[in-house]
Amino acid sequence: MGLPNAEEVKAFLMQLQANICAGLERLDGQASFATDSWQRAEGGGGISRVLTDGAVFEQAGVNFSHVMGASMPASATAHRPELAGRSFEAMGVSLVIHPKNPYIPTTHANVRFFIARKEGADPVWWFGGGFDLTPYYPFESDVKEWHQSAKDLCAPFGNEVYPKYKEWCDKYFFLPHRGETRGVGGLFFDDLNHWEFDKCFDYMQAVGNGFLTAYAPIVERRKDTAYGERERDFQLYRRGRYVEFNLVYDRGTLFGLQTGGRTESILMSMPPLVRWQYAYSPEAGTPEAELYERFLKPQDWLAD
């Protein structure tokens, strides 16, 4: 069966952060990550690692956090009354990568574990996470490869896992006020505890370890593509959607800001440069128009 082992999860997460940072440094070939360790007065802390102004990545942030408290914040117990009066531990790795070249997609990934304890009662625990891709220029082969990687890592856990978490990702990363998805999706899962602990932990590890396997080939393929001012302007405009989603809809961002989380780490996902343009509409027949017409809506990318 396997009892929840928070220390084992923490060790994996810290190693995952190190592995992903090393992999991104190899891909960039120029810049390295700066490390910022921090403590939380209420308990716990984290390690924020940020790469800026690299050859490939304009900014990449990879954050590890492990926070704890004697009681759950009211915002967390509102829809989970069984957590009231329990101490808690929450830990995770989250990352957002903003490349320089507009032909490389922006990406986000996150894996996390939560456990709440109470004397004389079984612990309440769950895993969450996923990864998603936000291209600026449409390459269907990249998107298919991304989703194939996601499907492959899900396969050992059951045929229903990929379609379930792929659909959840499409629904979660959606901007209602724009009527479009933030990108082309991937995987999103939360409240994962319906398998025994060891299997749930194995799945979280598969998602965490599978992220670079899915992303690195796309970076390698696109990083030397020539681009000009037009592509850069469109990239900066589309980055605005990232800001809109994270500040208006993202549960993790809102929870962190509402519960006194570390602002610098929470807002590490923001792109370093972004632009808005009133009533922008892409010119018909352009790659920019194709992104809007074909890519920013949920679909089965692996259909024959």
Swiss-Prot record:
Name the Gene Ontology biological process terms: protoporphyrinogen IX biosynthetic process
Residues recorded as binding substrate, renumbered to this chain, are S94, N110, V111, R112, G260, G261, R262
Query: What is the E.C. number?
Result: 1.3.3.3
Q: What is its main location?
A: cytoplasm
Cofactor(s) recorded in Swiss-Prot or TrEMBL: a divalent metal cation
Spell out the PROSITE patterns in the cross-references: COPROGEN_OXIDASE
Q: Where is this region: Important for dimerization?
A: 242-277
An example GO CC term for this entry is: cytoplasm
GO MF terms listed in the record are: coproporphyrinogen oxidase activity; metal ion binding; protein homodimerization activity
Q: Which InterPro entries match?
A: Coprogen_oxidase_aer (IPR001260), Coprogen_oxidase_aer_sf (IPR036406), Coprogen_oxidase_CS (IPR018375)
Please state the pathway this protein functions in, per its UniProt record: Porphyrin-containing compound metabolism; protoporphyrin-IX biosynthesis; protoporphyrinogen-IX from coproporphyrinogen-III (O2 route): step 1/1
Positions with a binding annotation for a divalent metal cation: H98, H108, H147, H177
Q: Where in the cell is it found?
A: Cytoplasm
Please give the catalytic activity noted in the UniProt record.
Answer: coproporphyrinogen III + O2 + 2 H(+) = protoporphyrinogen IX + 2 CO2 + 2 H2O
Any matching Pfam family: Coprogen_oxidas
- State the active site: H108 (proton donor)
According to the record's subunit comment, the protein's assembly and interactions are: Homodimer.
- Name of the protein this chain belongs to: Oxygen-dependent coproporphyrinogen-III oxidase
From which source organism is this entry?
Shewanella amazonensis (strain ATCC BAA-1098 / SB2B)
Species classification: Bacteria, Pseudomonadati, Pseudomonadota, Gammaproteobacteria, Alteromonadales
